[in-house]
């Protein structure tokens, strides 16, 4: 049974009437452009064929009822007429409540909803299961009540909910690609203007995601430290964001900066340039150049931004040794564990899978999880 069938069946069973709509919003993987989003820079993600699915129907009152199929059918119920506050014990509820609360501040021309939620975006892997949930919930209200909100506004609403209600700092990329993703394409997103340009993916290329299964521990505190270091760098150049600083300007005065801040700034500036070039390489079907850019990105994250761990570096080395110059591989996501992403010809997938299976656990003591994905469509009815 797929997620649509599962949520529709559960909806009818629990609520006693059929759902009127089923909405999906995908997870994502970022091909290149890491820690550039909160510096107003560029990112190049694609939506993947793992998603959050919600079967839903409008109610004729002001109550929102939610069933989480993946959490033993836990229930949350709240009123649109009372202040929406955080749930004490169900963390998943806060993503739903946060989205609805912030939606009310944007456009409160909506009533109650019944919904059943299920998803298959791996959690804790850096593939944006939370953004996928936020965008799916926002799209439910937009579709059921014909709210005049576009994908970018639904994405911004999800980001606000995560930053302000759930209390987790994040850039806009995850929600934006979940809302705006395009089948068989990546999106070059300008995180300042939220402009997105569809970049076609070469035919016969697989998007492979390998989870290191190294438990991320430092990610919150270190993420915030990196943000502060980037802000310090922008202040040094008297610019609103590092987006506005050129590599030439940086190189001229790099020695005057705190050495650690200088390394962080150099990563962001070089990564921005790599990301724009990567979009053009992908469009031309130049997988060799894309692979070089991904390798440079990984080295920069490892040496300048210092967000990789030995397990991730090992995984990258195993994949790189297998694919040579026929594709690319790098860490993807916030860092300190999580996943690597590889762009490789489909005929190389079995060899990569085998090499990783034979070597990664032997070298690290951890078993990886291997996903082969397709660039997929953003949020909407399914």
Swiss-Prot record:
This is Galactokinase. One of its GO terms (molecular function) is galactokinase activity. Mg(2+) binds at residues 130, 162. Keywords: ATP-binding, Carbohydrate metabolism, Cytoplasm, Galactose metabolism, Kinase, Magnesium, Metal-binding, Nucleotide-binding, Transferase. Belongs to the GHMP kinase family. GalK subfamily. Substrate binds at residues 34-37, 223. The keyword ATP-binding applies. Disulfide bonds: none annotated. PROSITE patterns: GALACTOKINASE, GHMP_KINASES_ATP. HAMAP family: Galactokinase. It comes from Salmonella typhimurium (strain LT2 / SGSC1412 / ATCC 700720). It catalyses: alpha-D-galactose + ATP = alpha-D-galactose 1-phosphate + ADP + H(+). The active site is at 174 (proton acceptor). The record marks 28 as: Transition state stabilizer. It is found in: Cytoplasm. GO terms for biological process: galactose metabolic process.
């Amino acid at each position: 049974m797929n997620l649509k069938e599962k949520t529709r069946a559960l909806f009818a069973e629990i609520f006693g009437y059929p759902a009127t709509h089923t909405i999906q919003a995908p997870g994502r993987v970022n091909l290149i452009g890491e820690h550039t989003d909160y510096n107003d820079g560029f990112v190049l993600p694609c939506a993947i064929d793992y998603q959050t699915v919600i079967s839903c129907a409008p109610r004729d009152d002001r109550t929102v009822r939610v069933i989480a199929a993946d959490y033993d059918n836990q229930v949350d119920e709240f009123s649109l007429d009372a202040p929406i506050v955080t749930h004490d014990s169900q963390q998943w509820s806060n993503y739903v409540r946060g989205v609805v609360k912030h939606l009310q501040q944007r456009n409160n021309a909506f009533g109650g909803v019944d919904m059943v939620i299920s998803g298959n975006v791996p959690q804790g892997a850096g593939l944006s299961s939370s953004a996928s949930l936020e965008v799916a919930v926002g799209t439910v209200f937009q579709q059921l009540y014909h709210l005049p909100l576009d994908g970018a506004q639904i994405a911004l609403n999800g980001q606000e909910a995560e930053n302000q209600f759930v209390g987790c700092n994040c850039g806009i990329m995850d929600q934006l690609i979940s809302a705006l993703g395009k089948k068989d394409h990546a999106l070059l997103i300008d995180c300042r203007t939220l402009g997105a340009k569809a970049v076609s993916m070469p035919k016969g290329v697989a998007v492979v995601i390998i989870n290191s299964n190294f438990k991320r521990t430092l990610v919150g505190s270190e993420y915030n430290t990196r943000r502060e270091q980037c802000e310090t760098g922008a202040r040094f150049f008297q610019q609103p964001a590092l987006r506005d600083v050129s590599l030439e300007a940086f190189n001229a005065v790099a020695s005057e900066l705190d050495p650690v801040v200088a390394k962080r700034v150099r990563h962001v500036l070089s990564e921005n340039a790599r990301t724009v070039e990567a979009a053009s390489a992908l469009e031309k079907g130049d997988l060799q150049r894309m692979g070089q850019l991904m390798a440079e990105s990984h080295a920069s994250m490892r040496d300048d931004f210092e967000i990789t761990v030995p397990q991730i570096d090992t995984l990258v080395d195993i994949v790189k040794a297998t694919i040579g110059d026929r594709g690319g591989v790098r860490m993807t996501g916030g860092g300190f564990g999580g996943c690597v992403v590889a762009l490789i010809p489909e005929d190389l997938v079995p060899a990569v899978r085998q090499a990783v299976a034979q070597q990664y656990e032997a070298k690290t003591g951890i078993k990886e999880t291997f996903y082969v994905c397709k660039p997929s469509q953003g949020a909407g009815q399914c």
